[in-house]
């Protein structure tokens, strides 16, 4: 991994004169494989994600972690999650092991500080770095993303309305979390349009609790179910994430950054 990070740093440094490409990584939380139209849904509507798939690359054979927290540990460290000690969500003390046949290995709930993050590597290569959303790798002290390579970082998870943020950030009453995070992401892009930037936008959606904007739920209220896809509220949550993708894409187009991102 150290060699890989070194090569990454060298590559971006060597081509700095050519303006290194911007990098945006958008993550949806607990989104099912077939919960977007491009992967089979005929009930949920994801036109912006579908457009990205049509213009880019779809991964149809790949390794992924079993749930949320190890996925994030692997993404940030560039290592298999098991190498970071993050095997599952939370500590093993959250389960009653007397009711389970197997006890897993001890699990850490924060990405160890000796793991170099992709944000730290890109920052060394001259990138502006921003993260807005669900971090889930530790928020206290040096574990907060602002201490792990991100120039700007706002963490939020737990609720889609009346949410809290770390650090505390003011927002209009009734604002939906996905819209709030997207607004911060768009602002970050606009302020860093003249330099290479790395934007990490990990949405809390579509994780429970199931909370959606009423106007989006109304779109799906009378739509006929297709197989197991039938919940207007969940559909509206997916639509909010898709809207976020659309807003980010539109911002790149407006700033003429799409071809270098």
Residue ranges and their predicted role:
Residues 2, 16-261:
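Formylglycine-dependent sulfatase
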Residues 3-13:
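Sec-dependent N-terminal signal peptides
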